[in-house]
Structure formats: structure tokens, C-alpha cells
Regions:
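Methionine residue identity
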Residues: 1-3
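N-terminal glycine/serine-rich phosphate-binding loop of ATP-dependent small-molecule kinases
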Residues: 5-99
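Conserved phosphate-binding catalytic cores of ATP/NTP-utilizing and phosphoryl-transfer enzymes
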Residues: 11, 100-131
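Gly/Thr-rich phosphate-binding beta-strand-loop-beta motif of the actin/hexokinase/Hsp70
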Residues: 19-37, 122, 128-147, 151, ...
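Conserved active-site and cofactor/substrate-binding residues in soluble primary-metabolism enzymes
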Residues: 50, 74, 110-117, 162
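Short, charged, surface-exposed secondary-structure boundary motifs
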Residues: 54-56, 100-105, 163-168
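General beta-strand structural signal in soluble alpha/beta enzymes
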Residues: 91-95, 111-113, 132-135
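Glycine-rich phosphate-binding loop plus the immediately following alpha-helix
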Residues: 113, 123-128, 152-169
Length: 169
């Protein structure tokens, strides 16, 4: 199955809110943003650099009520404060957010939010199945989810660019 540009966990949250939602996923090399109105994606954007300036532009075009931010680059208080001040409901995805899966990873506070997002999203899209989720981005991650919804963990390896550089391509 080919995954969406925006991680499926964020779709889980988008589909469980009504009205217009702002969905932000900050990865290692880019930030992906989607605008959802109920269950329909109205727009999506990819940014190399994403900050409050980009948010102000988006808020000028859309009337957001809810939002979620998933990031692997660490908490940005300026960005978070801006979103908290503008949105009726804002979720910063971290290990304290109640999820529809059971995380059996030994140290959930060290688990990359991209990996957690992939596990929740896959389970949401394919409930009741044993799943191996592979995400090929800056890194390649492998996540194992049981049919019961238990996330067992996974593995992370260098992405394709790093692999080719290592082989002098």
C-alpha cells in the first residue's frame, strides 16, 4: 500500500474532528502540511523551511479550527504557542497523546513521532491485521503492528540518499 504525503495518523485526527483542520508533519528534510475540511483534503503543501511566516499565510487563506503537529525535529515553542493561540483545539503529538493503539515500545519517549504516526496510521487504515509498515524518507523505517493494535516497535536504517552516497554514486 502506498501511503499518503501526510502521515495517516494525522488523517485519523483530521477525520475525527469536524470543520477545517490544519495538519502539519515536520520531517527531517521537509515539512508537509494538509488542509482538511471534514474528511476531504482541500490542499497540501511541502516546505523546506516551515515557521510562523508560513502559518500566517495559511491562516490568511483558511479558517482553521483544529490542528495537529507531528515533528521529529523537536518542540518549537514559538510555533506551538502560535498554533495554541489561533486554534480552538491544538494537539502536539508526543508520548502523552491518547492513541488508538497500544504502544509496547520499551522507551516511548525516545520513539520518533514519525514512526509512531506511521504505526497509528497504518492500524487506522487497515484495522485488525498484522502490519509491517515501511516508510522511505530521509531514513527508512520498519514498524510492526499486531492485529490487536499492539505496536511492537521496529527498525530504522539509512535512507536511499545516504545509501547511494555510501556507495559513491
Amino acid at each position: 500500500m502506498v501511503m499518503h504525503v501526510i502521515s495517516p495518523i494525522l488523517l485519523f485526527f483530521a477525520e475525527n474532528f469536524s470543520h477545517v483542520n490544519l495538519i502539519i508533519e515536520q520531517g527531517n528534510t521537509s515539512s508537509k502540511v494538509a488542509v482538511y475540511n471534514k474528511k476531504h483534503m482541500e490542499a497540501s503543501f511541502v516546505y523546506k523551511k516551515f515557521d510562523v511566516d508560513e502559518l500566517e499565510s495559511l491562516f490568511g487563506k483558511y479558517d482553521f479550527e483544529h490542528g495537529i503537529l507531528s515533528t521529529v525535529i523537536g518542540k518549537n515553542e514559538v510555533l506551538n504557542d502560535y498554533l495554541r493561540g489561533k486554534l480552538r483545539r491544538f494537539i502536539f503529538l508526543d508520548e502523552t497523546v491518547k492513541l488508538p493503539i497500544t504502544v509496547q515500545y520499551e522507551t516511548p519517549e525516545t520513539l520518533g513521532k514519525d514512526r509512531l504516526a506511521a504505526a497509528v496510521g497504518a492500524n487506522y487504515l487497515e484495522p485488525g491485521k498484522d502490519l509491517l509498515v515501511i516508510d522511505a524518507g530521509t531514513a527508512i523505517t520498519y514498524e510492526l503492528i499486531e492485529a490487536s493494535g499492539a505496536y511492537l516497535g521496529g527498525n530504522i536504517s539509512p535512507g536511499m540518499t545516504t545509501r547511494f552516497k555510501a556507495l559513491n554514486f
